[in-house]
Curated annotation (Swiss-Prot):
This is RNA polymerase II subunit A C-terminal domain phosphatase SSU72. Its main location: nucleus. The lineage of its organism: Eukaryota, Metazoa, Chordata, Craniata, Vertebrata. The gene is ssu72. It comes from Xenopus laevis (African clawed frog). One of its GO terms (cellular component) is cytoplasm. Belongs to the SSU72 phosphatase family. It comes from the Eukaryota. One of its GO terms (molecular function) is RNA polymerase II CTD heptapeptide repeat phosphatase activity.
Amino acid sequence: MPTAPLRVAVVCSSNQNRSMEAHNILSKRSFNVRSFGTGTHVKLPGPAPDKPNVYDFKTTYEQMYSDLLKKDKELYTQNGILHMLDRNRRIKPRPERFQNCKDYFDLVITCEERVYDQVVEELNSREQETCQPVHVINVDIQDNHEEATLGAFLICELCQCIQHTEDMENEIDELLQEFEDKSGRTFLHTICFY
């Protein structure tokens, strides 16, 4: 079993739904966790599919909540966006971009293949300093509230199993295979170095 707690990052596109739901569940189970997005802007559903609400990553969850409350309280209550932002603002002040974080993690879990590719590209573009390995694992999660919750519990279970391995480097492939068989999902996995 690792002596230190796993340092975990969960990454989706806008650091709103999937990564924040996993952040919430992992932090309640005492994991050392942070969450991020990889997009250039934060996008939330708007009044129509072609009219999203777009924010800068510097915008706080509180500011987004207030803005949407003013725009259309009924719509954003009904579609769950205000509830999601309320949860988010209780976890941390604002969304964060993975590309702007220079902290080291043992495990980076992404929520879709495009985000996985962006994280791997970012990590591989950095100059190696410590040669410390970081495992990047993709768990495909549809971007809706129900799937975010189911995906967060799967991510939590995966992190708990990895935390309890004797030798993460040698056991992770077998562990991921077991999770694939059990969940019916395919996980992408690679190792990058800091």
